[in-house]
Amino acid sequence: MTSVQNNPKGILFILLGMAVFSVQDAMIKFIYNDASLYELYFGRTLVAWFLLVCYMKFSKQKINLKTHYPFLTILRVICFFFGFSFFYVSLTYMSLAMANALFFSSPFFVSILAIIFLKEKVGIRRWSAIFAGFIGVFIVLNPDFNNFDYMKLAPIACALCYSISMTITKYTSDKDNVYTQMIHLYIGATIISILFFIFTGEGQFNSFSDPTFQFIFREWFTNP
């Protein structure tokens, strides 16, 4: 597998993406008491669909749904969808700053997966930076195993799922272009969100007093 390396450009797009995610996460943190998790996910997906279609039309990109890696594509979609579900759920009981700090364990997982599945080499400087970051995550997690709050693992579960999704994205990018991969993500998110609406959208399972479970099972399309 070969690919053209353009690290500065890649870093720039990562920073822009993280900035957008930060705004989105802050909005979810602000409104989670009045909405359902997968209602928000569905709305997020519709906005993403609109922006992607507009961009592809403007740049004259062809819509191609075919994938050369059907199993990996399904796995990537599932990991991405439920990975960020873990993160959004964590915002109901921890600060946005802490959730993001724990999510930044993702470089550790990405590096391990890249070595195993992509055969990439990670130098000592990058390992040093990753290790330092992981120590920071460990400090934030504060694992007192006698009184450990396992709910803190949700952002780390998100980081692991995200890392698997990104590793698959890199692996399949030799035959599936970026637009095809994004379309697959949005198709998957749309289908899974609709399934959640069918089975939980009327709030029939929302008999919980806990804000986290209320966020997951709250009725869709209701105003507070």
List the predicted regions and their residue ranges:
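Transmembrane alpha-helical segments that form core, pore/gating elements
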Residues: 29, 38, 52, 147-205
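Structural motif at transmembrane-helix junctions in multi-pass transporters
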Residues: 33-39, 86-103, 178-179
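C-terminal transmembrane-helix exit sites in multi-pass transporters
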Residues: 106-128
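Specific transmembrane alpha-helical segments of multi-pass solute transporters/efflux pumps
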Residues: 59-97
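Membrane-interface helix termini and inter-helical loops of multi-pass transporters
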Residues: 26-37, 141-150, 201-223
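Membrane-interface interhelical linkers
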Residues: 1-16, 49-75, 124, 187-224
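Hydrophobic transmembrane alpha-helices of multi-pass small-molecule transport proteins
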Residues: 125-142
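Hydrophobic/small/kink-forming positions within alpha-helical transmembrane segments
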Residues: 18-23, 53, 77-85, 107-112, ...
